[in-house]
């Protein structure tokens, strides 16, 4: 079974994200559990936690169908000690919020070296940050997202993801979210079935499908290998549709959240229906 949905708004209360997912015909969804553009957020109340858990249970969403995303401010590979510590504290808080809500994943961008330290050192800091967070939480898997490689962002090469995972002590609580637009921008071709076979074989060789915990299903406004992060609707842009057909027909992508972050929320119901028809 394919779990397909979108990153829906949690405005007005995180339990409303569940209603919005149901409204677009989704059986998966992503959300922010706090304002993603602020460092601090009020603690979750018992009332909020109960409302969210009840909404999920009523709508039939299991934890493995939900892929929460952390704040964009967090940089777990930051070169400066004070800024790194600030990011780590915020990341632990995000993990704890997921734990309170009964969620099993937290999706995040690995971080940036900001041209101040080496890639290797920044990747080491990301892994160390994950280890610290896992020690202080239970039941939540840290899900590293591949990036487009814009600026000094790490995570655009499969080898970056593998290097982080290799240094995480509890391998059972680390995973990867594969973003189709980001991979295309980073130079991983998926424009034909043959391209998909080759790219996902490389993913299996370098990272491993056992670590794949979710996907972001996005078209690409950016050009191939441009290292620029620009999403598009599924049937528009430069990526084409072969990869979406490939994903929908391959059982390796079953039972993980397949999350739209495409540019027009008005057509999310149509895009979800279209993806289901491909399978």
From Swiss-Prot:
One of its GO terms (molecular function) is phosphoric diester hydrolase activity. Endonuclease IV plays a role in DNA repair. It cleaves phosphodiester bonds at apurinic or apyrimidinic (AP) sites, generating a 3'-hydroxyl group and a 5'-terminal sugar phosphate. Zn(2+) 3 binds at residues 182, 229, 231. Its cofactor is Zn(2+). Zn(2+) 2 binds at residues 145, 179, 216, 261. Pfam families: AP_endonuc_2. Belongs to the AP endonuclease 2 family. This is Probable endonuclease 4. Keywords: DNA damage, DNA repair, Endonuclease, Hydrolase, Metal-binding, Nuclease, Zinc. The lineage of its organism: Bacteria, Pseudomonadati, Pseudomonadota, Gammaproteobacteria, Aeromonadales. Zn(2+) 1 binds at residues 69, 109, 145. It catalyses: Endonucleolytic cleavage to 5'-phosphooligonucleotide end-products. Its EC number is 3.1.21.2. Binds 3 Zn(2+) ions. One of its GO terms (biological process) is base-excision repair. NCBIfam families: nfo, PRK01060.1-4.
């Amino acid at each position: 079974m394919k779990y397909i949905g979108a990153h829906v708004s949690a405005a007005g209360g995180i339990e409303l994200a569940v209603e919005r997912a149901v409204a677009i015909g989704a059986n998966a969804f992503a959300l922010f559990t706090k304002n993603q553009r602020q460092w601090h957020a009020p603690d979750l109340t018992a009332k909020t936690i109960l409302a969210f858990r009840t909404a999920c249970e009523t709508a039939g969403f299991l934890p493995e169908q939900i892929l929460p995303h952390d704040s964009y401010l967090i940089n777990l590979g930051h070169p400066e000690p004070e800024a790194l510590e600030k990011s780590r504290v915020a990341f632990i808080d995000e993990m704890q919020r997921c734990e309170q809500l009964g969620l099993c994943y937290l999706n995040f961008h690995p971080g940036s070296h900001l041209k101040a330290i080496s890639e290797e050192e920044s990747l080491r800091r990301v892994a160390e940050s994950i280890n610290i967070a896992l020690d202080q939480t239970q039941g939540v898997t840290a899900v590293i997202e591949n990036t487009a490689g814009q600026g000094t962002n790490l995570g655009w090469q499969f080898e970056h993801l593998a290097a982080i995972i290799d240094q995480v002590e509890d391998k059972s609580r680390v995973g990867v979210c594969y973003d189709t637009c980001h991979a295309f921008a980073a130079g991983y071709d998926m424009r034909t079935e043959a391209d998909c076979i080759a790219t996902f074989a490389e993913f299996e060789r370098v990272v491993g499908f056992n670590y794949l915990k979710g996907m972001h299903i996005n078209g690409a406004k950016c050009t191939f290998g441009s290292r620029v992060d620009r999403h598009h609707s599924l049937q528009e842009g430069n990526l084409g549709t072969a990869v979406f057909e490939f994903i929908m027909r391959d059982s390796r992508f079953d039972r993980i959240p397949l999350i739209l972050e495409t540019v027009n929320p008005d057509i999310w119901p149509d895009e979800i229906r279209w993806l289901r028809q491909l399978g």
